[in-house]
Regions:
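N-terminal auxiliary segments of SAM/dcSAM-dependent transferases
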Residues: 1-29
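Class I S-adenosylmethionine-dependent transferase superfamily signal
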Residues: 85, 176-182
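Conserved SAM/SAH cofactor-binding pocket of Class I
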Residues: 59-158
Length: 182
């Protein structure tokens, strides 16, 4: 029995995707990692990296909404949830919302590398601000893995990207230099 027949929905990873950046590699301090099928993801070597939370979020979303064609990912970070889900939902379009400059930049590069520019609208901003989404935008599927620890509920990293991915902070109320309570 072939592997493809044994595991329903599994597809053998293919060649490097035809994205506009598929000829480039990671910058200094970054890695380019396999994420789903033939998709690759740019990540900082010592920054926030995709995790099983992202894999499970994408899996649950696409399992319970397998016909989604227009989806939203809130607190999207480096784009891992949306890219895993987009691989499982060929043809779906995605709006992602992320507050951090660095994470948005990595997500945009990953989308371009994977040839997803036409399927992804990567927005930078706070998803709690109504203006980030259009008044009449509708989505079949909404995923999210926003920060879930209040400040003081765990060890706070020295890395700014990691702090904002794990703790409920913003730039409005200080917790640590440059970071504030939500």
């Amino acid at each position: 029995m072939r592997v493809e027949e044994q595991f329903k929905g599994w597809t053998k990873p293919g060649p490097v995707p035809p994205g506009s950046l598929s000829h480039t590699g990671p910058a200094q301090g970054e890695t380019l990692d396999a994420i789903s099928g033939h998709y690759r993801l740019f990540q900082r070597s010592n920054g926030h990296r995709f995790s099983t939370d992202d894999v499970l979020t994408a899996w649950y979303g696409t399992t319970w909404c397998p016909s989604a064609s227009h989806a939203l990912d809130l607190g999207s970070g480096i784009g891992s949830v949306a890219m895993i889900a987009a691989w499982r939902l060929p043809g779906s379009t995605w709006v992602t919302v992320e507050a951090q400059d660095e994470s948005v930049s990595l997500a945009r590069r990953s989308a371009a590398y994977n040839g997803l520019e036409k399927r992804f609208d990567i927005r930078q901003g706070d998803f709690r601000e109504a203006a980030i989404l259009g008044e009449h935008e509708l989505f079949d599927l909404i995923t999210g893995s926003p920060p879930y620890f209040p400040p003081g509920e765990g060890v706070m990293s020295e890395d700014p990207q990691k702090i904002a991915c794990r703790f409920e902070i913003s730039k409005k109320r200080p917790v640590r230099e440059g970071f504030e309570l939500v």
